[in-house]
Amino acid sequence: MAQISLTFPDGKAREFPAGITPAEVAASISTSLGKKAISASVDGRHYDLQWPIETDAKIAIHTMADEAQALELIRHDLAHIMARAVQELWPDVKVTIGPVVANGWYYDFDREETFTPEDLGAIEKRMKEIINAREAVKTELWERARAIGYYEERGEPFKVELVQAIPEDQSIRMYWHGGWQDLCRGPHLQHTGQVPADAFKLMSVAGAYWRGDSANKQLQRIYGVAFKTRDELKAYLHMLEEAAKRDHRKLGREMELFHLQEEAPGMVFWHPNGWQIYRTLEDYMRGRLRQAGYKEIRTPQVVDRKLWEASGHWEAYKENMFIVEVEEEHAKEKRINALKPMNCPCHVQVYNQGLKSYRDLPLRLAEFGSCHRYESSGSMHGLMRVRGFVQDDAHIFCTEDQIESECAAFIELLSSVYKDLGFDSFEIKLSTRPEVRIGSDEAWDKVETALENAIRKVGAAYEIDPGEGAFYGPKLDFKLTDAIGRKWQCGTFQVDPNLPTRLGAEYIGEDGAKHRPYMLHRAILGSFERFIGILIENYAGKLPFWLAPRQVVVASIVSDADPYVAEVVAALRARGVRAEADTRNEKINYKVREHSVGKVPVILAIGMQEVEARSVSVRRLGETRTESMGLDQVVDQLAADARIPG
């Protein structure tokens, strides 16, 4: 029998018969590993323990201790177990697809009746019975005709369509347990009992069109979440409860920040309070960019298709653009424009005005650029996913030798900004060259090394995401962690030699010849709309004093105190504090409750005692005690707190 060489993570290699399975490899290492093994990685591919290995390869055996692989298998198996449970409870239901998604999985079903909360409970119960039965999970490769016949016989039209879409020369992998079979690429666990029965929960039912096309039949999508332990599930459910309390849409209403409506889907109507947050954040970012050597520009929102064709965006992105056709006077044809979905091609146009020398580089151009992208109605979510948004966008035009220093400076700026905004930790992911790419390996080596050196220079930790860079260059993604442990990808840093070439950007080098600059796309917040949503949820509406839209309310206890209330408000406003008077004929406790719901950080209560002493009674948001302070003292303190950082 032919032999193959398998190389293990420690670098050691062993000979095995061709066709050996990872399960057999694990058992050959130790009885214990053979029992604990759940899957393998073979040449970087996640591999089922039952699949044969036919050629030399690098191999790693995975156990439940390997978080990523274990969760993928648990969630994938639960998708199959749920589909089986549904069909055992309601045999007429048709199954479609059930992938793993963040924190869990979903499966789409074709059923006449709507799934109810009681149905979800029954499905969960049957799933636990299947898990506790510890049934073996088996797999086979079938010929295409056999798979089609199998599903046609069982009246599963969606599965027939899926099989028919697979190339004719490919075999079909089938998995089954307990007599229930499903078409699947795998891998899976070895028996249903390996799935933790107390660490999953069915969460919700939603509508979904077959293959995501509204012209197709609408299905019912059941979502589930799953973890390795019951405690992890409980922690996740607690986080969801906290997230519901912090929902920026709910707080946006309570704080009178913004609204959205059907006449302008995905476009934000900012109210005075919300617009104040927006403008304060913009002023803060403008100051930080100015300090970092950026020059602010403004570019058009409506741009002729010719520029988008030249940049390559028309071909790749047209479906997500808002197209505007205009009948120009004396023109034979309509002019086709688009609302810009991104700012980068316009920034190259600014760069291209006038001859540039190497002495002009790096040139950092920043814009709070309004962009519009068509997002499907089902994907939009408050401020987090909109069609009209503003990016804190900037592009750095530089030489290859300047990439490392510019990247390091950007990471330091991003870190400082996140810290000012209350996010002390973030993750960096470096996405490296994909298989399909432009440029030489030598050029990729230089740029990837420059990014790694920049990260190390600032002392940051990072992970590498192999092959996930753009076809023209590597990129960095920055994920911050909020108060309840959720991660948000906001910042980006993308190296791009392609767009300057497409749009004719040049500079004169030290040698007197023309050269192409590198273009570094970078953002810190991502979009103002989404980042404000993140801020609201991170702080549960209790924004830092400098960022709060209404910083102080000065509330009268008796009407005779109204003149002094006006004096206090005027003194605060003169020092840059956003202060309002509340002299309504209402009890002070009512006023305090109302402004606390509105998340006003400081309420100054004033009665005749405060008038006579020229003092104020200070109540801070979330505290029950009050503090008496002199007028000058409180004005000085609040004026200092109101200053924008940086």
Curated annotation (Swiss-Prot):
List, alphabetically, the Pfam families matched.
Answer: HGTP_anticodon, TGS, tRNA-synt_2b, tRNA_SAD
Domain of life from the UniProt record: Bacteria
The record's subcellular locations are: Cytoplasm
Q: Where is it found, in Gene Ontology cellular component terms?
A: cytoplasm
The entry's free-text remark on the cofactor is:
Binds 1 zinc ion per subunit.
In what residue span(s) does the TGS domain sit? 1-63
Region entry Catalytic: which residue ranges?
247-544
Name the SMART domains on file.
tRNA_SAD
EC number(s) of the enzyme? 6.1.1.3
What enzyme class is recorded for this protein?
A: ligase
What GO MF annotations does this protein's record show? Answer: ATP binding; metal ion binding; threonine-tRNA ligase activity; tRNA binding
What PANTHER family does this protein map onto?
A: THREONINE--TRNA LIGASE, CHLOROPLASTIC_MITOCHONDRIAL 2 (PTHR11451:SF44), THREONINE-TRNA LIGASE (PTHR11451)
- Record-stated family: Belongs to the class-II aminoacyl-tRNA synthetase family.
Q: Which HAMAP family match?
A: Thr_tRNA_synth (MF_00184)
What is the name attached to this protein's record? Answer: Threonine--tRNA ligase
